[in-house]
């Protein structure tokens, strides 16, 4: 369910414009939240009655949605590139 530091640093490098310290960029934050959401999806396939963790998942999804809304408002091009690379919307 959890991801290690190596996976996290790969995401930061990919979406942080090749800078490992660039963790505050909206794209990096959304990508990290997306990875956490995907990890929780597999958890819920096993543990369908885990309502406490489901509430945490909803909190993470809300944070990602707010960040995506901010990114779309500030830069539509960066928003579209991120959506395409993470395959979030169809």
From Swiss-Prot:
| Record's keyword annotation contains ATP-binding | no
Organism of this sequence: Blochmanniella floridana
Ordered alphabetically, the record's keywords are:
Ribonucleoprotein, Ribosomal protein, RNA-binding, rRNA-binding
Its Gene Ontology molecular function terms?
rRNA binding; structural constituent of ribosome
The uppermost taxa in this organism's lineage are: Bacteria, Pseudomonadati, Pseudomonadota, Gammaproteobacteria, Enterobacterales
Gene for this protein? rpsO
A single GO BP term for this record reads: translation
- What role does it play? One of the primary rRNA binding proteins, it binds directly to 16S rRNA where it helps nucleate assembly of the platform of the 30S subunit by binding and bridging several RNA helices of the 16S rRNA. Forms an intersubunit bridge (bridge B4) with the 23S rRNA of the 50S subunit in the ribosome.
Q: What is this protein called?
A: Small ribosomal subunit protein uS15
NCBIfam families attached to this UniProt entry: S15_bact (TIGR00952)
The record's SMART domains line, in alphabetical order, gives: Ribosomal_S15
Q: How does it assemble?
A: Part of the 30S ribosomal subunit. Forms a bridge to the 50S subunit in the 70S ribosome, contacting the 23S rRNA.
Q: Which InterPro entries match?
A: Ribosomal_uS15 (IPR000589), Ribosomal_uS15_bac-type (IPR005290), uS15_NS1_RNA-bd_sf (IPR009068)
Q: What GO cellular component is one of the record's annotations?
A: cytosolic small ribosomal subunit
- A Pfam family that this protein carries is Ribosomal_S15
Family of this protein? Belongs to the universal ribosomal protein uS15 family.
Q: Which PANTHER family match?
A: RIBOSOMAL PROTEIN S15, BACTERIAL AND ORGANELLAR, SMALL RIBOSOMAL SUBUNIT PROTEIN US15M
């Amino acid at each position: 369910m959890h991801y290690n530091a190596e996976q996290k640093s790969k995401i930061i490098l990919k979406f942080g414009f090749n800078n490992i310290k660039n963790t505050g960029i909206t794209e990096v934050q959304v990508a990290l939240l997306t990875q956490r959401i995907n990890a929780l999806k597999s958890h819920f396939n096993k543990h369908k009655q885990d309502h406490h963790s489901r509430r945490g998942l909803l909190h993470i999804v809300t944070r990602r949605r707010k960040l995506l809304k901010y990114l779309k408002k500030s830069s539509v091009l960066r928003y579209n590139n991120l959506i395409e690379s993470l395959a979030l919307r169809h």
